[in-house]
């Protein structure tokens, strides 16, 4: 390292902006000369937006519970002694997201190459939940998808609507070891999340990598996945595991797909846990409705 003198900078913290001087060093690595600020690295000052780690944490906590980056800007401004523009907030989130994405890619890569060290933690069961949220694409992503849709419409000689809404599914996955009682509530034990606009196989491989690197898989006797019935949530079920539709989505489909005068039949069977009677009830209702196509099609979702 070569000492190249002091350089002044500033950093945003939750207590306000702080100005300071730190040494700039010049270092040569593999024939390439670059400058580094060791104090910045020690203090974990992010390069993008010059924000302290505690302010970055505040941004990460704020953005998911606000409607937009502009709203997050307002919240940061009123709950801390500093201010960040909505563009700086966006850059911080993008940078953190890129780091997480790269880390997850590396986990999958090491798992595929059998280079992960097997875990030793012993548990008898692992539980998983999978669901999706459809969101509107914006900016560059929307333009790219619109262009693809336009080309497809031209190939198929169909009409193209440039103002159409472009949606994609944000997939969510959580894995945990069980529940523990805390006062009147139950909290999940060692919950771990995966979230992103990802392919199902990417979620499954990342999940498998984490299970392999944390647990002694020979000791796990039960793998159970709860989902909304979507094809991808069933497809990521662990080998030898069981898949079940969670009660919220079962009730949702009963309300949506079963004629109102018959709903209580199914709700009562579920509440009494008389699950073996549900399929005969579905078959009986199909007969009662005289096999009407649309009604039967909806009832098939309950099977």
Model-derived regions, located:
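Cys/His-rich short segments
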Residues: 1, 6-9, 13-44
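Catalytic center-proximal scaffold of phosphoryl-transfer enzymes
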Residues: 26-303
């Amino acid at each position: 390292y070569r000492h190249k003198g002091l350089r002044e900078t500033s950093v945003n913290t939750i207590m306000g902006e702080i100005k300071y001087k730190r040494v700039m060093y010049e270092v040569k690595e593999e024939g390439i000369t670059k400058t580094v600020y060791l104090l910045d690295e020690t203090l974990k000052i992010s390069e993008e937006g010059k924000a302290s780690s505690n302010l970055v944490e505040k941004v990460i906590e704020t953005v998911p519970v606000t409607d937009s980056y502009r709203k997050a800007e307002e919240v940061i401004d009123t709950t801390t002694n500093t201010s960040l523009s909505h563009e700086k907030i966006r850059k911080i989130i993008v940078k953190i997201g890129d780091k997480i994405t790269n880390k997850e890619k590396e986990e999958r890569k090491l798992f595929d190459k059998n280079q992960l060290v097997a875990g030793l933690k012993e548990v008898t069961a692992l539980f998983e939940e999978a669901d999706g949220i459809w969101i509107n694409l914006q900016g560059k992503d929307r333009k790219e998808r619109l262009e693809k849709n336009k080309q497809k419409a031209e190939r198929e000689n169909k009409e193209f609507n440039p103002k159409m809404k472009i949606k994609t599914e944000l997939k969510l996955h959580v894995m945990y070891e069980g529940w523990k009682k805390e006062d009147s509530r139950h909290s999940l034990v060692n919950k771990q999340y995966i979230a992103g606009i990802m392919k199902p196989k990417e979620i499954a491989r990342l999940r498998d990598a984490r299970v392999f690197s944390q647990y002694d898989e020979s000791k796990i006797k039960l793998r159970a996945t709860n989902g909304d019935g979507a094809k991808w949530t069933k497809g990521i079920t662990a080998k030898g595991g069981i898949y079940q539709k969670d009660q919220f989505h079962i009730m949702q489909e009963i309300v949506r797909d079963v004629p109102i005068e018959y709903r209580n039949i199914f709700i009562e069977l579920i509440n009494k846990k008389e699950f073996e009677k549900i399929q005969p009830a579905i078959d009986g209702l199909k007969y009662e409705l005289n096999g009407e196509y649309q009604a039967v099609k909806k009832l098939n979702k309950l099977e």
